[in-house]
Amino acid sequence: MAVTLGKVRLSYVTLVDAKDSTDVEHPKFASLDQLHEMLGDAIRAGEVSDYKFSVNVILPKDAKVPGTSELIIDRLEKAVMDAIDYAASDRSKTKLPTKYVPTLKKLWKDSGAMLTETQNILKTVVRDGDTDERAQDKPYLHGAYNFTADQRAYRRNQLSPIPVFAPGAGRPVELDPSEVHSGDYGFVSVTPYVYKFGKAYGIKFFLESVLKTEDGERLDGTVSAESAFGDVLEAYAEQSQDVFGEVASQEAESGKSMFG
């Protein structure tokens, strides 16, 4: 069942070109047009299913659901608990052994603890920014949980982008995915699920949609044009204003336009 989380921060945003991480050291990217071409190639058609859109969701531990006293992480936990219970039920094809349910529920938001306690039998993509070694030099992850949510570009027998929106008058309006950058803030709709890989089981998240609410300081190593050239443009504008102010003054005195 999908759950909406926000306000959260977005990192490692991959919404324009889908990413194939089969080779972790050398990931590949492809646009929807390129994936369409691949589908028409009998040799490469099978590769399309490896391409995914994704974002890394940074969820502050003390962040609350807007207008309520409920923590966002608690809302997510309810959805995760439901997903685990479903995976252990007779209705699920995953057939999660009931003996794993307590541990999966207890450690679902700490991948490090899960790894230590279960020796890779159980996994989770959720990391605790206060204990994860990889977060030590990333202060924006401290005091927060983070996890990757993704979705195949080819799903339901067709190629589809992730729906991306911005706030509108009374309802969200569509937003070009290229307008969402690593570091921006917003809301995400995700669906937690339990997967099976060999003898291991784990928690992952489908990415359903993204709502961008505001720009944030870039986390991808780039800077916006405003940040890069803001001071220069401001100084240029002031200088231009002085020049044209002087021109206007001279015109007023002479009664003639200096531009003909």
Positions of PLM-derived features:
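Solvent-exposed residues in well-ordered beta-strands and their adjoining turns
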Residues: 58-62, 193, 213
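Acidic, gly/ser/pro-rich intrinsically disordered tails
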Residues: 1-3, 217-260
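Broad gene-expression machinery/nucleic-acid interaction feature
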Residues: 52-54, 185-187, 202, 206-207
